[in-house]
Amino acid sequence: MDHAEQGPDRPGVDDPGRGRRIGIDVGSVRIGVASSDPDGILATPVETVPRSKDRGPDAPDIRRIADIVEEYEAVEVIVGLPQTLRGERGKAASIATVFAKRLRRKVDPIPVRMADERLTTVTAARALRESGVSARGQRPVIDQAAAVAILQGWLDERSRSVNAGDVGGDVQLPEAGQ
């Protein structure tokens, strides 16, 4: 799917069902990675991967993310698509889209989707600051926190879609407390 012209993906009929999802926040220097539990309810941080200057199909950053996808036995990868508040795209969106295309080729047949990530880094920084993490202390984890926000947003939307019957297959989310 070419994301150069269309908006971000949304959970829907092509949902792969139960399984872990990986969330990715692509930056120009670092990539934040998060994972969900197998039931797709809660996103947690995994690691921060340095961006590689190599933009080839076997670049170290792409390889590391592909290894994480395999290690976690992910059924879906969600890459944040940064847009302005008006839904416009800039350089950061182009970087994320190109990265997603490269990753898609590496992890095929696992689907790689783009999710709206407006303000996730701002929200993550605010949450870290409110939890007492200094600005300097945020650097190593801000990308992971943004990846968690991207993935949690996807999981929450997926849960609403499942409950509304918009997601195909035999997808059933467990009730709270199970």
Curated annotation (Swiss-Prot):
Region (Disordered): 1-23, 36-60
Subcellular location: Cytoplasm
Gene Ontology cellular component list: cytosol
GO molecular function ontology, one term from the record: nuclease activity
Pfam families registered for this protein in UniProt: RuvX
Basic and acidic residues biased stretches: 1-18, 50-60
Entries under SUPFAM superfamilies matching the protein: Ribonuclease H-like
GO biological process terms on file: rRNA 5'-end processing
Name of the protein this chain belongs to: Putative pre-16S rRNA nuclease
Family from the record: Belongs to the YqgF nuclease family.
Keywords assigned by UniProt, alphabetized: Cytoplasm, Hydrolase, Nuclease, Ribosome biogenesis
Known role: Could be a nuclease involved in processing of the 5'-end of pre-16S rRNA.
EC number: 3.1.-.-
Source organism superkingdom: Bacteria
